[in-house]
Regions:
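Alpha-helical segment proximal to the catalytic Tyr-Lys
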Residues: 128, 176-177, 238
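Short, small/polar-rich loop/turn modules that mediate ligand/substrate recognition or access, typified
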Residues: 179, 184, 240-242
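Active-site helix of classical SDR
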Residues: 123, 163, 171
Length: 256
C-alpha cells in the first residue's frame, strides 16, 4: 500500500520566503496548499510544485478576515485531506518606517491584524481541524516564521518588531498547549533574506553584510529557510517542541 503524502499549508506561499518553504516541502514529499491575498492562482508556481510529484492548490485568504478562516481550512481539507503541517509565513512589513512618536494607530492596527491577530486565529482554525482528525499517523507540526526582529529591535519599525515578538510568545504558549497532543510547535527566525521585500534596501545591506553584520558574510536565501522548515515538518525531531531556530547566518549571536 502506497504511503499517504503529508499535507502542509504554507500561508503567503506564492513568493519570497513562503515560496522557498513550499519548494522545499514539495521536494520533501508533501502535498501543498499555499495561500495569499491575490485572487488569481499562481499557475506557474503550482505547476512547479506539482512537478515534484505531489498535489498543490491555491486558496485566496486574507489573514485579517477572521470570519473566513474556518472556510479556508475546510476547503483545503476537502481538497487534499487532513492537514499535517501549518507553516505560518504570511505577513506584512511596517506600513511606514519612521519615528515611534509618529506611528499612526491605524498603521499599528494593520500590521498587528495580519502578522499577529490573523495568524493566531488562523492557527486556531487549523489546530482545531488537526485535533478533530483521527486517521493521520504522520508527524504533525505548526511552524511559525518570525524574524530576528522578534529579539533585535528596529526603532524605526517598532510595530513590525512588536508583531514578531508577539508571534514568538504565541509559539511558546502554543507549544505547551499542544505538547501532549503530539503536535510540535517550532519558531524559525529568518535574518536578512533576499526577497522582494528586501530588494529596496539591498544596497544598504550589501554594505553592512560585507562589513560583518552577518558573520557568514552573505545574504540568506528563501531556500535556506525552506530547508530548515522541511526538516522540522518531516518529524525528525520527535522530542522537541517550542524550539527557536535562527536562519540568520549568525546575525543574532551576541558579540562584544
Amino acid at each position: 500500500m502506497k504511503a499517504r503524502r503529508q499535507i502542509a499549508v504554507v500561508t503567503g506561499g506564492r513568493k519570497g520566503i513562503g515560496l522557498g518553504i513550499a519548494r522545499a516541502l514539495a521536494k520533501g514529499g508533501f502535498d501543498l496548499a499555499i495561500t495569499g491575498i491575490e485572487k488569481e492562482a499562481p499557475t506557474a508556481v503550482l505547476e512547479e510544485l506539482e512537478a515534484a510529484g505531489g498535489r498543490a492548490i491555491y486558496r485566496q485568504s486574507d489573514l485579517a478576515v477572521l470570519s473566513a478562516h474556518a472556510a479556508t481550512v475546510d476547503a483545503i481539507s476537502a481538497a487534499l485531506g487532513e492537514i499535517d503541517c501549518l507553516v505560518n509565513n504570511a505577513g506584512i512589513g511596517a506600513v511606514t518606517r519612521g519615528d515611534f512618536l509618529d506611528l499612526a494607530p491605524e498603521n499599528f492596527d494593520r500590521i498587528i491584524d495580519v502578522n499577529l491577530r490573523g495568524t493566531v486565529f488562523f492557527t486556531q482554525a487549523v489546530v482545531r481541524s488537526m485535533l478533530a482528525a483521527k486517521t493521520s499517523l504522520a508527524p504533525r507540526s505548526v511552524i511559525n516564521i518570525t524574524s530576528v526582529s522578534a529579539a533585535l529591535s528596529s526603532p524605526e519599525r517598532l510595530d513590525y518588531c512588536i508583531s514578531k515578538a508577539g508571534l514568538s510568545a504565541f509559539s511558546q504558549g502554543l507549544a505547551l498547549r499542544l505538547a501532549e497532543t503530539g503536535i510540535a510547535v517550532f519558531e524559525v527566525r529568518p535574518g536578512i533574506i533576499r526577497t522582494d521585500m528586501t530588494a529596496q534596501v539591498s544596497e544598504k545591506y550589501d554594505a553592512l553584510i560585507e562589513r560583518g553584520l552577518v558573520p557568514m558574510k552573505r545574504w540568506g536565501e528563501a531556500g535556506d529557510v525552506g530547508s530548515i522548515v522541511a526538516a522540522l515538518a518531516k518529524g525528525g525531531f520527535g522530542f522537541a517542541t517550542g524550539s527557536v531556530i535562527p536562519a540568520d547566518g549568525g546575525l543574532g549571536i551576541g558579540r562584544l
